[in-house]
């Protein structure tokens, strides 16, 4: 399975959320293979300790980039980048979430989102809402899942 290098991960997070968080500082040191390249697929395997760090990093990214109560211009800019007033522009939360998630997943996966991926993400949103999460909390839950997906 292909994964991002630490630098690629941090840069992708910066591009997605518009903030530089450097969450990979707590990741295990990357090994450089005989090729001399950091991004050689021969050395970028996924250790269990690294997977745990990815899960923690996804939570950290969502918490720091999209806090429940934004207090800085950077927070408001990031929220605008992700949520984009879709809830006001669409007739239902499900339509709004589908629009927000389609845009985010396309950027996160660096390719067009498939119909099945969007359906699955929207279903996760609906389940989150059914479990008592707010609109934004349910969106953030799906975003966190996307950040640990092999497609990311």
Where on the chain are the PLM-derived regions?
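Low-complexity, glycine/serine/threonine/alanine-rich intrinsically disordered linker
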Residues: 1-152
């Amino acid at each position: 399975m292909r994964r991002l290098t630490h630098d690629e991960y941090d840069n992708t997070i910066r591009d997605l959320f518009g903030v530089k968080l450097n969450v990979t500082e707590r990741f295990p040191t990357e090994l450089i293979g005989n090729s001399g390249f950091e991004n050689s697929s021969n050395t970028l395997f996924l250790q269990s300790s690294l997977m745990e760090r990815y899960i923690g990093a996804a939570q950290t990214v969502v918490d720091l980039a999209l806090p429940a109560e934004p207090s800085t211009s950077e927070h408001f800019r990031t929220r605008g980048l992700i949520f984009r007033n879709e809830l006001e522009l669409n007739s239902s939360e499900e339509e709004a979430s589908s629009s927000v998630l389609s845009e985010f997943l396309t950027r996160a996966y660096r390719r067009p989102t498939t119909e099945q991926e969007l359906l699955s993400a929207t279903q996760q949103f609906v389940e989150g809402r059914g479990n008592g999460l707010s609109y934004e909390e349910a969106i953030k839950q799906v975003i966190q899942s996307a950040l640990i997906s092999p497609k990311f």
